[in-house]
C-alpha cells in the first residue's frame, strides 16, 4: 500500500515453521499492479537478528531504507529511454546517490499511538489515518486467502470467500498452553526494532 494497492497477489504463509504458534511466522507475497509493476514482500520471525529492508525500484532509480538510512540512487533519465537509445545491450548508467540518515530515535508503534493521542487532544492531522489501515489489512487478508487456497487472489478480496476459509481454520483451532509464564513485551520490542 506504500506504492498503491496491487491488483492481485499470490502468497505462502508458513504456520509454526519456527515457533509453536498457530499463526504464520514466515510469509512470502508476490504482487502484481495495474501498471505492470511487481512487488515482493518477505518476512520471518525465524531469522535472527534478521534484516529490515525496504527497497523500491523504478525506471528512474531506486530507494533503499536499511539500518536507519534512506539511500536514493537516481538516474538522470528513464532507464527505458537509455536502453532504447543505446547500441549496448546493458548500457552503463551514471547515478546520483543521496543518503539521508534517521536523526531521531525510532518510535515505532509507540510513536503512532502518541500521534493518535496528540490528534485527539490537539486536533492535529494523523500521521497514519485509520482509512489507510484498510489497505494493509486488505493485503494481509488476501495473502492469507491465497496461502490457504494456493491460488492467486484478486484485490479487493471476496469477503464471503475469505470469511468461509477463516471459519474453517477457526473450527480446527486448538487451545494451546502459554509457552512462558512471563511478560515478553520487552523481548518482543527489542527484537523488532526496524530503524526506518
What are these regions (language model features)?
Residues 11, 41, 65, 72-74, ...:
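Short hydrophobic/aromatic-rich beta-strand segments that constitute the beta-sheet cores
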Residues 28, 33, 59-131, 153-196:
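C-terminal glycine/acidic-rich active-site capping loop/insertion
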Residues 50, 136:
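Short catalytic/ligand-binding loop motif for oxyanion handling, primarily in non-cytosolic enzymes
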Residues 1-38, 43-49, 55, 131:
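Rossmann-like dinucleotide-binding domain that binds NAD(P)(H)
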Residues 3, 113-124, 141-148:
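Short, hydrophobic alpha-helical segments
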Residues 52-53, 57-59, 140-142:
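Generic detector of contiguous secondary-structure segments
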Residues 21-22, 52, 67, 166:
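Short, well-ordered secondary-structure micro-motifs
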Amino acid at each position: 500500500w506504500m506504492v498503491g494497492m496491487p491488483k492481485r497477489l499470490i502468497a505462502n504463509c508458513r504456520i509454526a515453521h519456527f515457533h509453536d504458534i498457530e499463526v504464520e511466522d514466515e510469509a512470502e507475497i508476490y504482487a502484481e499492479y495495474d501498471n505492470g509493476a511487481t512487488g515482493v514482500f518477505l518476512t520471518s520471525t525465524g531469522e535472527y537478528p534478521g534484516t529490515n529492508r525496504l527497497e523500491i525500484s523504478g525506471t528512474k532509480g531506486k530507494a533503499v531504507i536499511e539500518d536507519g538510512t534512506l539511500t536514493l540512487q537516481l538516474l538522470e533519465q528513464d532507464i527505458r529511454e537509455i536502453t532504447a537509445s543505446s547500441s549496448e545491450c546493458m548500457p552503463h548508467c551514471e547515478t546520483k546517490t543521496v543518503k539521508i540518515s534517521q536523526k531521531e530515535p525510532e518510535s515505532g508503534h509507540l510513536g503512532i499511538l502518541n500521534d493518535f493521542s496528540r490528534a485527539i487532544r490537539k486536533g492535529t492531522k494523523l500521521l497514519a489515518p485509520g482509512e489507510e489501515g484498510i489497505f494493509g489489512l486488505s493485503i494481509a487478508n488476501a495473502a492469507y486467502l491465497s496461502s490457504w487456497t494456493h491460488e492467486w487472489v484478486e484485490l479487493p478480496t471476496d469477503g464471503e470467500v475469505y470469511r468461509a476459509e477463516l471459519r474453517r481454520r477457526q473450527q480446527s483451532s486448538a487451545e494451546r498452553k502459554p509457552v512462558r509464564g512471563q511478560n515478553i513485551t520487552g523481548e518482543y520490542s527489542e527484537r523488532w526494532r526496524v530503524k526506518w
